[in-house]
């Protein structure tokens, strides 16, 4: 296997809670109102330093989606999922976007975002 090159981000960054690998920035947040099994999650336009799992259809609150789990390249931890295909027309905006689960990441949200309640997505 080849060498893994990691991207270092600048600004207000979100990192893997386990190994501190950079994952995204606050500028890439599209929505703070997502839910996962273990609490809140954010939808990001761009996520770096992740690998993807197998594609699968998954039934979510907003309908059926084709997704891949995403894993931190630093430690292999599952940090969320990426939308590959949305079956519902109203959900097409999610295609190609990634969701990071807040309990698996650290970042700017740790200071004040966790105080507010998000809507289910």
UniProtKB/Swiss-Prot annotation:
Signal peptide: none annotated. Residues 12-109 form the Yippee domain. InterPro entries: Yippee (IPR034751), Yippee/Mis18/Cereblon (IPR004910), Yippee_fam (IPR039058). GO terms for molecular function: metal ion binding. Keywords: Metal-binding, Zinc. Belongs to the yippee family. This is Protein yippee-like At3g55890. It comes from Arabidopsis thaliana (Mouse-ear cress).
């Amino acid at each position: 296997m080849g060498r893994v090159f990691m991207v270092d981000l600048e600004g207000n960054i979100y990192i893997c809670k386990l190994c501190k690998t950079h994952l995204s920035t606050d500028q890439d947040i599209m929505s703070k109102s997502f839910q996962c099994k273990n609490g809140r999650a954010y939808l990001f336009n761009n996520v770096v330093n992740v690998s993807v799992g197998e594609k699968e259809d998954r039934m979510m609150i907003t309908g059926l989606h084709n997704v891949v789990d995403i894993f931190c390249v630093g430690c292999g931890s599952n940090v969320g999922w990426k939308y590959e295909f949305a079956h519902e027309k109203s959900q097409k905006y999610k295609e190609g976007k990634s969701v990071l689960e807040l309990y698996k990441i650290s970042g700017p949200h740790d200071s004040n975002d966790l105080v507010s309640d998000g809507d289910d997505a």
